Amino acid sequence: MCDDEVAALVVDNGSGMCKAGFAGDDAPRAVFPSIVGRPRHQGVMVGMGQKDSYVGDEAQSKRGILTLKYPIEHGIITNWDDMEKIWHHTFYNELRVAPEEHPVLLTEAPLNPKANREKMTQIMFETFNAPAMYVAIQAVLSLYASGRTTGIVLDSGDGVTHTVPIYEGYALPHAILRLDLAGRDLTDYLMKILTERGYSFTTTAEREIVRDIKEKLSYVALDFEQEMATAAASTSLEKSYELPDGQVITIGNERFRCPESLFQPSFLGMESCGIHETVYNSIMKCDVDIRKDLYANIVMSGGTTMYPGIADRMQKEITSLAPSTIKIKIIAPPERKYSVWIGGSILASLSTFQQMWISKEEYDESGPGIVHRKCF
């Protein structure tokens, strides 16, 4: 492990996108959708080289003839065979490396079932013969990437949203909150409210078009009621979007109604608190002495925090919940879409981290349970 030539591999398996690359790099080399697609139809032409499954971008580009499945739901791996295909694709097709020659750092959502990380460990050592591996908590890596040791991370991706308070490098597990409301739910909601305008999107392939509309045109309103009034009174907020077949659609108040459900989950028929209340509740579960430091270091990470206006709205909402004398600071770095991966890259290249790896020898001696002792 002392050999500096061997760069560790960092793989951040998100519910929506898989980010992979080499430790020490400042950005992931490969970013592709965590999708496995299987043909819906019978192949009739011989010699076409049809495969029985497609992964990532290739599945995305052939989506018209495939059924697309995401093996990771709400941050938990639900289909291990498909997950193995995604890892295989990551190592051999995207990064073009032999996994048996590099230590592998994987990431995981907090409050995941224990069996999940055991199985991850088992597959890395037994299927891919990795020399060493480690499983890190996603939100902790985001904090590394922001250069802090204290703060509360709001990590919101495609499948799951978490708030994780960390003080002087220690995660406070009793105060971690998890919200199963994230990007995929917002895409579904946008599909629904676009139907009210007379645009119908139904299939798994059309859902990807709506996801693109969401990513390009949505924003968070600072004052929702006022924005609704503006949208009703004029057309200044309307934007147009061209569909793949050349048809142009117009989208108005849907632009901010969609991400508003992060703050008002009742829009989706969910009983849970909005993300601002979740952050507040998480801070309130911490010791009274450290709350002040957490309020001053609220770090946003993940793709669902990329909406324009979300940081200002968060500042406003938390300010109205917190005591009036407290200083509140929201940190929303521009690269936050990849901050989990960047944090992993930083962690895996630290010299002090090198003794933390789980080696193949330790695994052979103790079995998959070792992951709970060495990774927390």
From Swiss-Prot:
<keyword id="KW-0206">Cytoskeleton</keyword>
<protein>
    <recommendedName>
        <fullName>Actin</fullName>
        <ecNumber>3.6.4.-</ecNumber>
    </recommendedName>
</protein>
<dbReference type="GO" id="GO:0005856">
    <property type="term" value="C:cytoskeleton"/>
</dbReference>
<dbReference type="InterPro" id="IPR020902">
    <property type="entry name" value="Actin/actin-like_CS"/>
</dbReference>
<dbReference type="InterPro" id="IPR043129">
    <property type="entry name" value="ATPase_NBD"/>
</dbReference>
<dbReference type="GO" id="GO:0016787">
    <property type="term" value="F:hydrolase activity"/>
</dbReference>
<dbReference type="GO" id="GO:0005524">
    <property type="term" value="F:ATP binding"/>
</dbReference>
<dbReference type="GO" id="GO:0005737">
    <property type="term" value="C:cytoplasm"/>
</dbReference>
<feature type="propeptide" description="Removed in mature form">
    <location>
        <begin position="1"/>
        <end position="2"/>
    </location>
</feature>
<feature type="modified residue" description="Methionine sulfoxide">
    <location>
        <position position="45"/>
    </location>
</feature>
<dbReference type="InterPro" id="IPR004001">
    <property type="entry name" value="Actin_CS"/>
</dbReference>
<keyword id="KW-0378">Hydrolase</keyword>
<dbReference type="InterPro" id="IPR004000">
    <property type="entry name" value="Actin"/>
</dbReference>
<feature type="modified residue" description="Methionine sulfoxide">
    <location>
        <position position="48"/>
    </location>
</feature>
<comment type="function">
    <text>Actins are highly conserved proteins that are involved in various types of cell motility and are ubiquitously expressed in all eukaryotic cells.</text>
</comment>
<comment type="similarity">
    <text>Belongs to the actin family.</text>
</comment>
<keyword id="KW-0558">Oxidation</keyword>
<feature type="modified residue" description="N-acetylaspartate">
    <location>
        <position position="3"/>
    </location>
</feature>
<keyword id="KW-0067">ATP-binding</keyword>
<dbReference type="Pfam" id="PF00022">
    <property type="entry name" value="Actin"/>
</dbReference>
<keyword id="KW-0963">Cytoplasm</keyword>
<keyword id="KW-0547">Nucleotide-binding</keyword>
<keyword id="KW-0007">Acetylation</keyword>
